[in-house]
Amino acid sequence: MQRSRTAADDAALLLAGLGLRESEPTAGSPGRVRRGPRAVDEAAPASGRRGKGGCGGPEAAPDVPSRPERGPRASLAGSDGGSARSSGISLGYDQRHGPGPGPPSGGSARSSVSSLGSRGSAGACADLLPPGVGPAPARSPEPAQFPFPLPSLPLPPGREGGPSAAERRLEALTRELERALEARTARDYFGICIKCGLGIYGARQACQAMGSLYHTDCFICDSCGRRLRGKAFYNVGEKVYCQEDFLYSGFQQTADKCSVCGHLIMEMILQALGKSYHPGCFRCSVCNECLDGVPFTVDVDNNIYCVRDYHTVFAPKCASCARPILPAQGCETTIRVVSMDRDYHVECYHCEDCGLQLSGEEGRRCYPLEGHLLCRRCHLRRLGQGPLPSPAVHVTEL
């Protein structure tokens, strides 16, 4: 590298010498410069000897100091980092005394030195080349080379063919958990909150009151905001209140009165038949059994009865045993036999003499006599050998 740079510097000096010879003024010439620089202030080859090319070249100048000059006279050839010597052609003189007839420079002397010096002496002599010969094309800077080889990092196993087996397993488990969560959410759906209109998910978020569903956070006291789930509350004017606010905030003035005892209902209220009751006051008028949560019925006078006492009081009486005809156990339909405008139990409808069970079948028909239920044979025996009457018509109601 040092030899090639020295040869390039010598060639540059030779071309500079030729330029100086052409630029010498003649007798009739005012001393104008044809090409290249007008004069050379300094030219110091690296070795301090004559340049190649023989006659016409500049003589060797004394050794320049190791510290190169700065400013417009700086050398065009870059200095070598391993040598204390410097060489090159100074362009500062022509640029200080005006441009020559040659091609104009693209920038200042300092910028030209820095740009050409990095490319060597051949680039510095672009203005000294013969006509028709252009400078070498500029090269882009090569990427920096690392002095040591970079280590190659191995790829994780399975990356060339997509995700690894562990990643696929993790993705499958994630999808399975999402499906399980969606299924659980669907199972825990209770309905729509009547207050906010949103869905209710989870047993802890559901609250049922007054025949409607609420969110636990939606069913609260309108006065203090306390949650009323599992607590006593009072409904006043389509608003609900906790027990404390209802009792100590003047709401007792609007409290309902029990239809039985006439007292204010300050605790739980039971509403039936358009009236309000204490739970303990809603009882059967016959047996006095509490009917809270128990089926009941009423008569024409709105008297309350349990089902058993209602049938006992209002059910038809059997003409044979004088007991009421009630529905069978577990059945709501009353079955009775009507004969001679009288009601009978099915088991009480039999012959009074022989006990034969009477019905509408042949041989079991009823032949009444003087208000008595008799079969055909017993009827003839009571009449002797007299003519037989026609069998009595009986009706069985189901």
UniProtKB/Swiss-Prot annotation:
Tissue specificity comment: Expressed in kidney, lung, eye and ovary. In kidney, restricted to podocytes.
What Pfam families has UniProt attached to this entry? LIM (PF00412)
Location of the protein in the cell: Cell junction, Focal adhesion; Cell junction, Adherens junction; Nucleus; Cytoplasm, Cytosol
**Zinc: is it a keyword of this entry?**
yes
What InterPro entries does the annotation carry?
A: Ajuba-like, Ajuba-like_LIM1, Ajuba-like_LIM2, Ajuba-like_LIM3, Znf_LIM
Q: Which GO terms describe its molecular function?
A: metal ion binding; transcription corepressor activity
- Key words of the record: Cell junction, Cell membrane, Cilium biogenesis/degradation, Cytoplasm, LIM domain, Membrane, Metal-binding, Nucleus, Repeat, Repressor, RNA-mediated gene silencing, Transcription, Transcription regulation, Zinc
Comp. bias regions, Low complexity: 74-90, 106-124
Q: Which GO terms describe its biological process?
A: cell projection organization; cytoskeleton organization; miRNA-mediated gene silencing by inhibition of translation; miRNA-mediated post-transcriptional gene silencing; negative regulation of hippo signaling; regulation of cell morphogenesis; response to hypoxia
- Ranges of compositional bias, category Pro residues: 132-157
Q: Which residues form a coiled coil?
A: none
**What GO CC terms are in its UniProt record?**
adherens junction; cytosol; focal adhesion; nucleus; P-body; plasma membrane
Where would I find the LIM zinc-binding domain in this sequence?
191-252, 256-315, 316-385
- Domain of life, source organism: Eukaryota
Sequence segments annotated as region (Disordered): 16-166
- Record PROSITE patterns: LIM_DOMAIN_1, LIM_DOMAIN_2
Do you know which CDD domains this protein is assigned to? Answer: LIM1_Ajuba_like (cd09352), LIM2_Ajuba_like (cd09355), LIM3_Ajuba_like (cd09438)
Job description of the protein: Adapter or scaffold protein which participates in the assembly of numerous protein complexes and is involved in several cellular processes such as cell fate determination, cytoskeletal organization, repression of gene transcription, cell-cell adhesion, cell differentiation, proliferation and migration. Positively regulates microRNA (miRNA)-mediated gene silencing. Negatively regulates Hippo signaling pathway and antagonizes phosphorylation of YAP1. Acts as a transcriptional corepressor for SNAI1 and SNAI2/SLUG-dependent repression of E-cadherin transcription.
Family listed: Belongs to the zyxin/ajuba family.
Relate the assembly described in the record. Forms homodimers. Interacts with EIF4E, AGO1, AGO2, DCP2, DDX6, LATS1, LATS2, SAV1, EGLN2/PHD1 and EGLN3/PHD3. Interacts (via LIM domains) with VHL. Interacts with CD2AP and WT1. Interacts (via LIM domains) with SNAI1 (via SNAG domain), SNAI2/SLUG (via SNAG domain) and SCRT1 (via SNAG domain). Interacts with ROR2. Following treatment with bacterial lipopolysaccharide (LPS), forms a complex with MAPK8IP3 and dynein intermediate chain. Interacts with PRICKLE3.
- Return the protein name: Wilms tumor protein 1-interacting protein
In its UniProt entry, the species of origin is given as Mus musculus (Mouse)
Q: What is the lineage of its organism?
A: Eukaryota, Metazoa, Chordata, Craniata, Vertebrata
Q: Which gene encodes it?
A: Wtip
